[in-house]
């Protein structure tokens, strides 16, 4: 259990000392991120598609409602079935349901083994590979397809038991990444510090497309670069100006998903016809 104002970095450091972690890898995005902000924003990192989201690790929460009344929901242990499951509703609520004062979270031990494999392939082939692997008993943890410097690569992170990770490396192929910077690269993916994010032009917004994992490659408007693909195909980041807002919304809806304006200048936000689409009930369980 942590107070809402506890710095997220401080909590993660304390957990790491005990070989524990928050498996959903909440992004910080800037210094000073707090536990309460993490829950209110409801954002998850690269491992989201494999391990679950913030709400899946919520055990209990205390809030102050609109009448100034202190309320507590849930508990501090897994076996907790009393009352309404308001704790999970707080994840991604952006403070609309109350001011969070403290949070109880489920944590897990760090994986005993980890490996990252790289594959040179286009987006369509990357999605095909991810769909095929998803139907196999492989310790998939995170994935990222990115086109950088003219080269398109799919990176897949494996986590789990030593034997499972080693067996997956042998069966999946690809090039095993042995650089000391690999863990930092995944952190850069989580924190949007990869070169792909840095190349965004000042007049471009960063769009977050939430799609079914089985969605095909999207035919983006002319002049819009290939997306960065995470969550085994379910999350696609797109850099585009406000003039492409309508097209992105239409593409996402046609694929059974939604588009949200994630990072933009005030001018972009004002000119975009709608910052975000409502998620379908099925997608709301994933994103």
Q: Where do the model's predicted regions map?
A:
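N-terminal glycine-rich flavin-associated loop
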Residues: 1-30, 39, 43-76, 111-119
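Short, conserved charged micro-motifs
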Residues: 10, 124-129, 163-170, 214-223, ...
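Conserved glycine-rich FAD pyrophosphate-binding loop
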Residues: 30, 177-287
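C-terminal substrate-binding/cap subdomain adjacent to the FAD-binding core in PCMH-type
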Residues: 40, 59-203
């Amino acid at each position: 259990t942590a107070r809402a104002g506890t710095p997220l970095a401080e909590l993660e450091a304390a957990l790491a000392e005990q070989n524990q972690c928050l498996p959903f890898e909440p992004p910080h995005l800037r210094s000073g991120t707090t536990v309460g902000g993490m829950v209110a924003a409801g954002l998850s990192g690269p491992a989201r598609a494999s391990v679950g989201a913030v709400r899946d690790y919520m055990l209990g929460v205390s809030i102050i409602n609109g009448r100034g009344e202190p309320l507590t929901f849930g508990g501090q242990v897994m076996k907790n079935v009393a009352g309404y499951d308001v704790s999970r509703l707080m994840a991604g609520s952006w403070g609309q349901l109350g001011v969070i004062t403290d949070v109880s979270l489920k944590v897990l031990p760090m994986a005993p083994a980890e490996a990252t494999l790289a594959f040179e392939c286009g987006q369509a082939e990357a999605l095909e590979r991810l769909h095929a692997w998803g139907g196999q008993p492989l310790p998939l943890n995170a994935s990222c397809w990115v086109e950088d410097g003219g080269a398109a690569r799919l990176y897949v992170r494996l986590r789990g038991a030593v034997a499972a990770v080693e067996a997956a490396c042998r069966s999946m192929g690809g090039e095993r990444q042995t650089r000391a910077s690999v863990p930092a690269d995944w952190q850069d993916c989580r924190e949007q510090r990869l070169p792909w994010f840095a190349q965004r032009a000042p007049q471009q917004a960063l769009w977050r497309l939430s799609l079914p994992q089985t969605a095909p490659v999207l035919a983006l408007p002319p002049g819009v670069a290939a997306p960065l693909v995470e969550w085994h195909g379910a999350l696609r980041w797109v850099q585009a100006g406000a003039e492409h807002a309508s097209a992105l919304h239409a593409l996402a809806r046609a694929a059974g998903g939604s588009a949200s304006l994630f990072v933009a200048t005030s001018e972009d936000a004002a000119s975009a016809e709608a910052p975000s689409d409502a998620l379908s009930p099925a997608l709301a369980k994933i994103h």
